[in-house]
Curated annotation (Swiss-Prot):
Lineage, top ranks: Bacteria, Bacillati, Bacillota, Clostridia, Thermoanaerobacterales
Function according to Swiss-Prot or TrEMBL: Required for the insertion and/or proper folding and/or complex formation of integral membrane proteins into the membrane. Involved in integration of membrane proteins that insert both dependently and independently of the Sec translocase complex, as well as at least some lipoproteins. Aids folding of multispanning membrane proteins.
Name of protein: Membrane protein insertase YidC
Keywords: Cell membrane, Chaperone, Membrane, Protein transport, Transmembrane, Transmembrane helix, Transport
Assembly, per entry: Interacts with the Sec translocase complex via SecD. Specifically interacts with transmembrane segments of nascent integral membrane proteins during membrane integration.
GO molecular function, one term: membrane insertase activity
Gene: yidC
TM regions (residue ranges): 22-42, 88-108, 130-150, 160-180
Length: 206
């Protein structure tokens, strides 16, 4: 983790050299990382699209085998195999930003320059957001991002809990980490919007 933090720090310093503000540098840094993750995102969205398409079939299986969990699980996995769907295939792109989050947190805590780096209303990117604006944005953007890819209404409560959890976590983290998370969420929301729009366009043409 220390090695990753060191390289991330070097990349951030390189960006800061050109933009002149660490807050802006974190935003540019985040966009750069998200662009690198685009191939994984496309794979994730393709998998989620397939999951959404077979959701009516899954609901039929629940009605048919709802009283037999073991049979339901077997038939569901059989359906996934027939449709060539890996239900866990979309997890990696969701985890990669989190994997970067901890080294970034370490970097923000160990780089002395960040303790005096200001951005907008924040006097230090190594400290918590004093007005809780970043945690609120983290909560809202996390919910919007997860709600856009939800396959059924039953996931809404889970999305709310996850969003509140991320908001609470962001309260305890340096503002710089929160800026990274909010920027990452906004980038993902835009990605999902474009993907969904393109999918509808293709359906209309077919």
């Amino acid at each position: 983790m220390a090695t990753i933090a060191m390289y991330l720090g070097q990349l951030l310093e390189f960006i800061h050299h050109y933009v002149g503000n660490y807050g802006v540098a974190i935003i540019v840094f985040t966009v750069f990382i998200r662009i690198l993750l685009l191939p994984f995102y496309i794979q994730q969205m393709a998998m989620m699209k397939k999951m959404k398409e077979i959701q009516p079939l899954v609901e039929e299986l629940k009605k048919k085998y709802g009283k037999d969990p073991q049979k339901l699980n077997m038939e569901t996995m059989k359906l996934y195999q027939e449709k060539k769907i890996n239900p866990f295939g979309g997890c990696l792109p969701m985890l990669l930003p989190l994997i970067i989050l901890w080294p970034l947190f370490t970097m923000l805590r160990t780089y002395p320059a960040f303790s005096t780096a200001s951005f907008l209303w924040m006097h230090s990117l190594a400290e918590r957001d004093p007005y809780y604006i970043i945690p609120i944005l983290a909560t809202v953007t996390t919910y919007i991002s997860s709600a856009m890819v939800a396959t059924d209404k039953s996931q809404n409560s889970m999305n709310i809990m996850m969003s509140l959890f991320m908001g609470w976590i962001t309260v305890t983290l340096p503002a710089g980490v929160g800026i990274y998370w909010v920027t990452s969420n906004i980038f993902q929301i835009v990605q999902q919007y474009i993907f969904m729009r393109e999918t509808k366009t293709l359906k209309g043409e077919s």
